[in-house]
Amino acid sequence: MQPAIRLLIYIVGLLTAASAAAGIIDSDTYREDRTLFLQAGKALDENRPGDYRRLAGQLQDYPLYPYLQFRELRARLKQADPDEISVFIERHKDDPLGWRLRQAWLYALAKQRDWPQFLAAWHGTQPVKLQCYKLQAQINTGKTAGLVEHALELWMVGKSQEKACDPVFSYLEDNNK
């Protein structure tokens, strides 16, 4: 065999071995983080906030860290600072976590009847129940621009709507709309 071909085979072999070793090293990169992630999730499940914060603090560069943040924020939506929730939603506006937290937060705000905060958190298209809560929020805050048109769209469907729509439909009837 020619020396150039032998050298080429040797180099290809080295590169193959190096890339295989890199794959093994890469697969071990997150081993400790995976363990910490599972422990942090268990701390959340067992309502051990101190342990959660200690463990989560070590995971800020871990790709699944936002899922821990989501779980933790969702668990304490009623007590969480609205700015903290807004920051998370904004940071994750293009992924399902932001969307899911926004919906959970909107439902929590509607349940609390915190209409000003509900309107501040509102964004985009939402399920009918949340649309009706938005209309309730508009009624209760006096921000009724566009309300009648939207309420009539919800009224003019060929099926019963969510119970959350009843106060909105009563508003239409009371105001002869």
Where are these regions (language model features)?
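N-terminal signal peptide c-region/cleavage motif recognized by signal peptidases
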Residues: A17-A21
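Alpha-helical solenoid repeat scaffolds
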Residues: G23-K177
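Bacterial N-terminal signal peptides that target proteins for export
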Residues: M1-L8
